[in-house]
Amino acid sequence: MNGEQSANGARTLPDDAVVVVPVSNVIFPGVVFPIVLDRPSAVAAAQQALREQHPLVLVLQQDVQAPDPGPQSLHRMGTLANVLRYVTGPDGAPHVACQGVERFEIDEWVEGFPFLVARGRRIPEPEAEGAAIEARFLHLRSQALEALQLLPQSPPGELVAAVEGASSPAALADLVAAYLDLQPPEKQQILETIDLEARLDKVSAFLAQRLEVLRLTSEIAQRTRQSLGERQRETLLREQMAAIQRELGEGEREELVELEAAIENAGMPEEVVQQARKELRRLARTPEAAAEYGMVRTYLEWLVELPWGVPEAAPIDLAEARRILDEDHFGLEKIKQRIIEHLAVRRLAPEGKAPILCFVGPPGVGKTSLGQSIARAMHRPFVRVSLGGVHDESEIRGHRRTYVGALPGNIIQAIRKAGRRDCVMMLDEIDKMSAGIHGDPSAALLEVLDPEQNVAFRDNYLAVPFDLSRVVFIATANMLDTIPGPLRDRMEVIQLSGYTAGEKRQIAERYLVRRQLEANGLTAEQVQIEPAALETLIARYTREAGVRSLEREIGRLLRHVAVRFAEGHTEPVRIGPTNLEPILGPPRVENEVAMRTSVPGVATGLAWTPVGGEILFIEATRTPGDGRLILTGQLGEVMRESAQTALSLVKSRAEALGVTPSLFKESDIHIHVPAGATPKDGPSAGVAMTMALISLLTDRTVRSDTAMTGEISLRGLVLPVGGIKEKVVAAATAGVRRVLLPARNRADERDIPEETRQTLELIWLERIEDAIEAGLDPRRGDVRQTQVRAAS
């Protein structure tokens, strides 16, 4: 077998070939070693070997500094190894853990792969028989055990056990050679020594040199310890004197007295009090100059500064809560009502286990500020824990005190910052966490958010239980897809959609302009921004679901005005639509209506993104060919299948549409979805793709004031899709007047803002025929004749 093409287009490895990975150190049989894959070719080699379950051959480079070694710069003898694990390190570099199996000699190289592939033969171990080999085996074992005893630091118990339990002379020689501090060429020399007696002699000779160094090092260390004896004796006498003073009640440090009083007054549970007293006694026995003294003192300070008790909470006033929510946020009526329900349950059952709210929506729609409003309504402190980019479980649970610079996790740190155990804690960007080599932080959050477990949350640093049951947890996320299922199951998801243009104008008038006036040292009497200017700012200078970019643009306008007042201008300034371009420059958002072209083969679709809805143009054209379907625009697998389905549906309806069937065999059809640099996926473009193909093949244009969404089936049914509200709002913002939607999504109509429904005509589709009737411009004359003329 010379290699075949796999399903994904990659060439498979021949059965008698192996993948070769150059390494900078020698890997011996029977030994497990991690390897960093620092070249793209090495990554591709390891991935294909894993995928096809091929072993790797690890071969030493002759020049370890060579950036991309070829066959000529590699040794012929290497080690056949199995890949045990493939992980990505904290630095982003892939790592593999490999276990050597046996020696392997390369005979010839196989070309045609993006990495090194070779053929060769396995080198079996020779028979270990005879008294000479047995004597060398026992001598090498005694040398290795002596070397392990002479090491400055205690060796791992597994290594000692491996030396003592080596089953064969060959295995022992390879194990010792692997851990010897030798240069790579010396290790390669041992690897290439097949004769067992010669190999044992070489390893024993190298180990004997190392033993001499270790013996000399041990003697020097012994003399150093003797010279330090007097100093240690003085330190011991000082410690004894301090102990005598403590027994007599003399010289007690004021700091210890303060800590003892703080422990008694902190309101800690009895278990925690006992632990604190134990650490306090340990602190009293420790000299202040010792490094351990600072660690124990810091630990005790953390214990006494945490809010162990729960103050009596003020009753929740629902009318006040409504006022605060309306004062801080415009719109979001359903969200506010759900928050009021949440607060009502908290008022009636303060000790109850209320659900954990998770606000999901695009950036800038007010997720974090909603949490702050909840804290104001409950009269509790608000703390925010940012989880974006967290990939270490210790960020949640804390580090054990054995580590230098250890601290509690973010949860306990936030509790200390709040100063109250019943605070409102926002877990921000909970969807941005990721698992790393140090554990999965989302798994640690399962305990934090579970009411059955968080009554005794145990931080690794504190090592005592802390009750989190009175904390009001609120989470935020931009999308749900990246939140693990068990974690998502512990939260009640509340979706926040993007704002309409009218809502953005209201928010700007009520909140953003006032906030930016204060930030720039101006007053409403000095500057006025006309409503028409705000509308132009929203439509032509920002494109977002939230209002962050809008606030930045308002800030730019006001900073321009602030310069004028700082230079002595005194007259009030009024900013209208005509003033925007001189200050902000030309509009940065193109008019989507102007981008449309009323030519056959172009349809306007609608898409959902994590930052709101977008309109999507589907372009189709045909060229002479042999019936291929060409798809471009970074389309995902699902979207590609939608295009195939759309083409098959059009082929099946060719006669009814007046399309010559032979046209499909004589032409290539190309579907493109701008922008080409943006990845796209999902089934909701099925109707738009079908309409673009029908428009192309019948020479009838799709109405330029119409956008559409929906999944299509081979039977011509229009299936429901998600994100209806966001898509319809995006269509209205882009100037569309008619929107074609799946009839099975009619229940989502109530989520569409009233002002948007008043400006759009919503047409509900059961089948593709409904879309053809509503979406294509009527043409005079016989469509079949038009198509024949176009084909000719």
Curated annotation (Swiss-Prot):
Induction: By heat shock. PROSITE patterns: LON_N (PS51787), LON_PROTEOLYTIC (PS51786), LON_SER (PS01046). GO terms for cellular component: cytoplasm. InterPro entries: AAA+_ATPase (IPR003593), ATPase_AAA_core (IPR003959), Lon_bac (IPR027543), Lon_bac/euk-typ (IPR004815), Lon_lid (IPR054594), Lon_proteolytic (IPR008269), Lon_Prtase (IPR027065), Lon_prtase_N (IPR003111). The keyword Cytoplasm applies. The active site is at S684, K727. Disulfide bonds: none annotated. It comes from Phenylobacterium zucineum (strain HLK1). It catalyses: Hydrolysis of proteins in presence of ATP. HAMAP family: lon_bact. Keywords: ATP-binding, Cytoplasm, Hydrolase, Nucleotide-binding, Plasmid, Protease, Serine protease, Stress response. It is found in: Cytoplasm. Residues 597-778 form the Lon proteolytic domain. This is Lon protease. Homohexamer. Organized in a ring with a central cavity. Residues 16-211 form the Lon N-terminal domain. It comes from the Bacteria. GO terms for biological process: cellular response to heat; protein quality control for misfolded or incompletely synthesized proteins. Belongs to the peptidase S16 family. ATP-dependent serine protease that mediates the selective degradation of mutant and abnormal proteins as well as certain short-lived regulatory proteins. Required for cellular homeostasis and for survival from DNA damage and developmental changes induced by stress. Degrades polypeptides processively to yield small peptide fragments that are 5 to 10 amino acids long. Binds to DNA in a double-stranded, site-specific manner.
